[in-house]
Amino acid sequence: MWCTAGGGEEETKDMKIVHISDIHAAEPHFLPDLAEKVIEKINEIEPEIVVVTGDLTESGYAFEFERAKGYIERIECGVKVVIPGNHDARNVGYLAFEEIFGPRSKVERYGGITIVGIDSTQPDLDDGHVGREKYEWIEKCLKTSDFKVVALHHHLIPVPKTGRERNIPMDAGDVLELLIRCETDLVLCGHKHVPWIWNLNGMIIVNAGTACTNRTKWNISQSFNLIEIDEPEKEKGTIRIYRMYPRGGEELVLEKRRVKK
């Protein structure tokens, strides 16, 4: 649960999470020079955690995964959570993903933060689906007093400026109810290449744009997200979300104070 941040609070150490998405490491849309700038900028930030919310590839081929892996490995960060997107599930790409990046759904815990990565893809389909068979596992992972982060490729709420909307998970309503019931603090998504933020019943939902491709919507630049969390192990703290532009510049898009129920 969050409320608007006030002034005059004592400065505390931040935990930094970088959220990138939709790399699509294959021609003709991938921009290698921009990918270099993304890596350079992330390494300057020195985040504790990096989350990649899918679409590492264009068509799910092994050489695309290897190329994406090469870039991700150059990010200087001890904790990396990588999950697949719908493009990664094409051409049995989910098998290559598992071999290179491990399980498609996973949980990581670090410094008072629990991150639950969920595979929302289906083979050779753009539509998303989490699946009831995962609900019990998700709920178990979120039974913690940590700052709770859930990451999945498909956004759970439609995103403006994306045209006809048909790509939220088929069970988005059930997943939203589950995450809110589990008092999830933050949800990270990608998919439509348009950055956006929703605040739903105190749960912040952050959509990332594409980090380093030319597959951008009109008048929207490539970007990734930086999330700063003051002392996640404490009952109160401030979250700040910045939109980072690899071509230069940044923008503070959200500042909220966390208040545990």
Locate predicted features.
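Beta-strand-turn-beta hairpins that frame and shape the catalytic cleft
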Residues: T12-V18, V107-G117, K143-F147, N199-I205
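Short acidic, glycine-rich surface-loop motifs adjacent to enzyme active sites
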Residues: T144-K161
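Extended active-site neighborhood of metal-dependent phosphoesterases/phosphodiesterases
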Residues: A62-T144, D174-I180, L226
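Conserved beta-sheet core of the metallophosphoesterase superfamily
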Residues: R164-E235
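A short C-terminal boundary segment appended to hydrolase-like catalytic domains
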Residues: D230-K261
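Active-site environment of divalent metal-dependent phosphoester hydrolases
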Residues: A26-H29, E58-F63, N86-G93, P123-D126, ...
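Active-site neighborhood of phospho(di)ester-bond hydrolases with catalytic His/Asp-centered motifs
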Residues: H19-S21, V50-D55, K80-N86, D119, ...
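N-terminal active-site segment of His-dependent metallophosphoesterases
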Residues: W2-Y71, K140-T144
